[in-house]
Amino acid sequence: MKLRDFIEIDYILFFSIITLLILGIFFIYSSGVTSTGNLVSNEYIRQIIWASIGIAAAIVLSIVNYRKFYDIALYLYLFSMVPLLYTFFFGRVVHSTRWLRIGSFGIQASEFAKIAVIIMLARYLADTERDNKSFFRFFICCMIVFIPMGIVLSQPDLGTALVFISILLSMTFVSGILMRYLLFIGSCIVFSGFFLVLPLWQTYIFRKNIPAIAALANSKIIILAALFLFIIAAIAMFGFLKFKKRYFYWLVYITAIMILSLGASYAARLVLKNYQIMRLIVFLDPNVDPRGAGWNIIQSITAIGSGGLTGMGFLQGTQSHYRYLPEQSTDFIFSIFSEETGFLGGLVVFALFFIICQRLLRIMKTTTDPFAVYVCAGLAGMFCFHFLVNVGMTMGIMPITGIPLLFMSYGGSAVLAAMIGVGLALSIHIRRYSR
């Protein structure tokens, strides 16, 4: 690496991430201390090891020309499918099949698949820039993302599957793909969630039978409704091809959204485990099961609220040290952090993530290479989604999905994969004016 390249590293991005890693290690340590002051977990030591490996990987990748990943994008993508499939068939940890066991370590293959998808999708978008309005181009983009996403969702890991959607939307938006295509995906997600949650709301919260809502949980009615909508779509498609009227096109568009949303919501009921269904229910009302599925949300909100403006002090939190808050070193690390550092500490984390995303967008804006632009867009979308969903989850404004707070939550796979992405961004920044 030349001295000039060393000087060109984006130190603001790099040290913002180092700061988050250090904060994460301190509060992973805090999560392992009981109310009597005993340390009952060595997770912080493992996190130090993974963070060190991740920092080294980021530095090494910043030295390597990122264009080499353009050349091997397809191979990386196909290779990432192997551990995903192996995990699906053979990996088992607690409630899901998300982890590969290697000795005493668990490897989350889906974390590395995100990076492979970003690289592969960036190459395809860069290679097809001249055809950026094509529906076929958007369809291929969806297939690149939906194949690994489908494997992850079937494990089932809803949270990680949603991260793939954020990558797809952010990268295709930057590529200039027609907004109606992005709106189609977004509408399918919204209506799928609506059709999935509404019967749960009726059963567990409203507790009164509404036939129209109950029908959304009836497989026979869903199939009949989908067939009816399909017939309407077919007639509308014929009308559009024959008469070239735009209202036929939009009728096909809307009915397709409804068909896919009904199908996706029904498939979700078959795939999701009972504990995942309960997470959706307690998101609507945690008091439905305050000592069961709603416990995490209630205790997390209590922890954040008890922190006040300046926090209770390092190692002084009650929710964490009295072990009221489960998964406190992973999903709910922000809850512990806010309890002990308060609102002002939470603002620091918000500011650091804002800086990281701003620096990625700045690199994206200044680089002259389309491949680099799309890689940065995918990384920014992934980092922002992780942050917004995890923090929203701890505050009770998002359902619990198991998405970690990148760079702070305990987890070697997430840290290492994220730092690989950071290394790519640093490499792009160094070479942003050359192709």
Predicted regions and their residues:
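Flexible extramembrane loops and terminal tails that flank transmembrane helices
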Residues: 1-13
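A juxtamembrane structural motif centered on a specific transmembrane helix
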Residues: 1, 390-435
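Glycine-rich, flexible loop/turn motifs
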Residues: 2, 89, 95-98, 103, ...
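Hydrophobic alpha-helical transmembrane segments of multi-pass inner membrane proteins, especially
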Residues: 14-30, 34-292, 335-395, 420, ...
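TM-adjacent membrane-interface loops and short helices in multi-pass inner/ER membrane proteins
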Residues: 282-333, 341-345
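Glycine/serine-rich anion-binding loops at beta->alpha junctions
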Residues: 104-113, 155-156, 308, 312, ...
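Helix-boundary and loop/linker segments of multi-pass membrane transporters
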Residues: 5-7, 138, 322-325, 367-368
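Gly/Ser/Thr-rich beta-alpha loop segments that engage phosphate groups in nucleotides
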Residues: 26, 56, 161, 296, ...
